[in-house]
Design a protein with these regions (language model features):
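Hydrophobic/aromatic-rich transmembrane helices and adjacent perimembrane loops
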Residues: 160-161, 358, 362-395
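Transmembrane alpha-helix segments characteristic
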Residues: 137-138, 332-363, 413-420
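Perimembrane helix-loop-helix junctions
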Residues: 206-243, 247-251, 419
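Juxtamembrane "helix-exit" motif on the non-cytosolic side of transmembrane helices
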Residues: 32-34, 92-95, 142-154, 245-252, ...
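Intrinsically disordered, polar/acidic, low-complexity terminal segments
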Residues: 5-7, 11-134, 224-235, 252-338, ...
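Membrane-interface alpha helices of multi-pass inner-membrane proteins
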Residues: 186-202, 207
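Aromatic- and kink-enriched transmembrane "portal" helix at the membrane-lumen/periplasm boundary
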Residues: 100, 132-170, 174
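Membrane-interface transmembrane helices that cradle and orient dolichyl/undecaprenyl
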Residues: 163-187, 221-222
């Protein structure tokens, strides 16, 4: 009776959509761990500048400027042809760059749009909604979350890689629609989307290989010619984009040698270098970054700081995959499954090859056995399709064995446990970025609350947080973004390596406690040349700070004697900031050792 009820439930037309919906909820929760990380790479300056621009420019002017930039690119006035690229182009999507959480959720939205379209394209190409659902449930677990956040497009670069893959997937869907209807508009749309992908990021050129695999799967014939004919539409868009790309490079080179007016620039990092050993090494290392556990295995990362949310996400996502596997009654043929695997391999290897031939990444600094570069996230889509094909092979193998009915429950539990463990391991490892995110947040909130306003625009403000490695332009952009002030900002690490003769210097620092409720930032006037001690200290408390907490610090007298102090917050002068935080003024004492300031619960 119970078995019949179970079959009735799983046989319902709503069962598969519900499983996919559950997978989406827990997949989003799982991947949203990326919101804990600070900005990395070029985001540290681009996001600040672009958000300041969008908040100080009328929206119509933003649209007009963006349109002019696209036309400028189409007129071959840019060294690289990327009219549809996200960063560093300033457009309306710059609104999503101003907050760590919003920015990462913006990237996650692009990623899940790609997941949904990949699953849809898989279902169309294989003529199996269940295989599409399997791809949808598997793909969230395929991304390598523990990687250097400066080059992982789950964290950085405004979803550049994801926004390149999305029009490729749309081109594929339009291509298949053209096959069904023979209406030329679908061929034109397919060509346009492929043109758009190649004009977003150069890895777009490599995806024609994967689209060929999709076309061959869909035509289902034993001959290659129908698939090649179907690929004419997206290939034409790619060829047109390639012409613009080469034209832009030619104009740039002619300017560099003085034949054309204007100043050309060196774009050597995106020009090919065909040193075969270097290409193969970089190619393989970049491909390895597309596998979910590769970085943690090579980095010898152990699953620590595991929280209940990690376990819940792992169990739920694994259960969704197992539910779809249980529904797979009709398996694709061996040839179809091989084509699916090779299509995934093309999605994995083709973008990695473009990185492999670039001299910028052949030096072993940006790409190694633990870290890949930007395309690694979209490479994981290929790993996901390969995993779907591997599951089909395993199902075909075990379903023909006499022992399968007896061992099926045990094998299913072991498989689910392995997938759940992968999720738990990845999510807990990604939490290692949390302290960096907390530091960035409390530091930014302090500046936003006006902590450094008293210093004005002339007095140097030396910051403990090194924005973009302490770059002066980035430091200034940070204050423009969060305080709307043209602050004379410097990095403490850089300041201490230089000679300065300013009479008054302020130091802006921060201290992380045991959790977010005890994080603080502070400003004081330097009392020594090395900025170790400060006077006239004001402390910023975030709105979630413990109101019953105590500020602890150490003072250093002129004779070098240090004394520890504690001040209950209730006994200190407090001013409410507009962002919900609180500014607390410490009483005048001997100079305070800045690194000792902390909030205790």
């Amino acid at each position: 009776m119970e078995r019949n009820n179970l079959k009735k439930i799983t046989g319902s037309r709503w069962f598969l959509p519900v499983v996919c919906a559950v997978s989406f909820v827990f997949g989003w929760w799982y991947l949203s761990i990326t919101t804990c990380a600070p900005l990395g790479g070029d985001d540290e300056i681009i996001n600040l500048q672009n958000y300041y621009y969008i908040t100080h420019t009328p929206w119509w002017q933003v649209v007009l400027t963006h349109a002019k930039e696209i036309l400028n690119q189409l007129a071959l006035q840019s060294p690289r042809f990327r009219p549809f690229s996200s960063p560093p182009v300033r457009s309306l999507n710059s609104w999503f760059l101003g907050d760590l959480v919003v920015y990462r959720l913006y990237i996650l939205a692009w990623t899940y749009a790609d997941i949904a379209l990949t699953a849809w394209l898989t279902a169309k190409a294989t003529h199996s909604k269940k295989l599409g659902a399997l791809a949808f449930c598997l793909l969230p677990m395929m991304f390598s979350l523990w990687q250097d956040a400066t080059g992982n497009s789950m964290y950085s670069y405004g979803a550049l890689a994801q926004s390149t893959l999305l029009p490729v997937l749309l081109a594929g869907l339009c291509m298949l629609r053209w096959q069904d209807t023979h209406h030329m508009r679908w061929a034109v749309l397919s060509a346009f989307f492929m043109f758009m992908a190649c004009g977003t990021f150069e890895i777009g050129f490599t995806y024609i290989a994967a689209l060929f695999g999709i076309a061959w799967l869909y035509t289902g014939s034993g001959k290659v010619l129908p698939a090649l004919r179907l690929c004419v539409a997206p290939l034409s868009g790619e060829v047109i984009s390639f012409g613009f790309n080469m034209g832009s490079r030619l104009v740039n080179n002619l300017r560099r040698v003085g034949i054309l007016e204007g100043q050309g620039i060196d774009i050597g990092g995106v020009s090919p270098n065909f040193d075969l050993p270097a290409v193969l090494r970089t190619w393989v290392m970049q491909m390895s970054a597309g596998f979910p556990l590769n970085a943690m295995v090579f980095g010898k990362i152990k699953p620590t700081n595991v929280q209940i949310s990690d376990v819940i996400c792992g169990v739920a996502l694994a259960a969704c995959v197992m539910a779809v596997l249980a529904l797979l009654d009709r398996l694709p043929t061996r040839k179809e499954n091989l084509l699916l695997f090779l299509t995934g391999l093309a999605l994995l290897s083709a973008p990695a090859l473009l990185i492999g031939i670039s001299p910028k990444y052949q030096d072993g600094i940006n790409v190694d056995w633990r870290h890949g570069y930007i395309p690694q996230t979209v490479e994981s889509f290929g790993v996901g399709l390969m995993a779907v094909a591997v599951f089909v092979v395993l199902l075909r193998f075990v379903r023909g064995k006499n022992w399968w009915p007896k061992l099926r429950p045990v094998c299913s539990v072991l498989l689910a446990a392995g997938m759940a463990f992968s999720v738990v391991w990845q999510r807990s490892a990604a939490r290692s970025y949390e302290k960096g995110g907390r530091a960035y947040t409390v530091f930014a909130e302090g500046v936003e609350a006006g902590l450094a306003d008293a210093a004005g625009t002339e007095t140097p403000v030396v910051t403990d947080y090194p924005v973009w490695g302490g770059d002066l332009e980035a430091e200034n952009a940070f204050f423009l973004r969060y305080a709307d002030t043209d602050t004379n900002a410097h990095s403490l690490a850089v300041w201490r390596t230089e000679s300065h003769d300013e009479a008054t210097v302020c130091r802006l620092g921060f201290a992380l406690g045991s959790d977010k409720r005890t994080d603080i930032s502070w400003l004081g006037t330097a009392a020594d040349d090395n900025l170790d001690t400060v006077t006239g200290v004001t402390v910023y408390l975030p709105k979630q700070a413990d109101p019953a907490g105590t500020l602890a610090y150490t003072t250093r007298a002129a004779d070098g004697i240090e004394t520890e102090h504690t001040q209950p917050l209730a006994e200190l002068a407090q001013t409410k900031a507009e962002n919900g935080g609180t500014l607390v003024t410490l009483p005048e004492t001997a100079p305070i050792v800045g690194d000792t300031l902390r909030l205790q619960s």
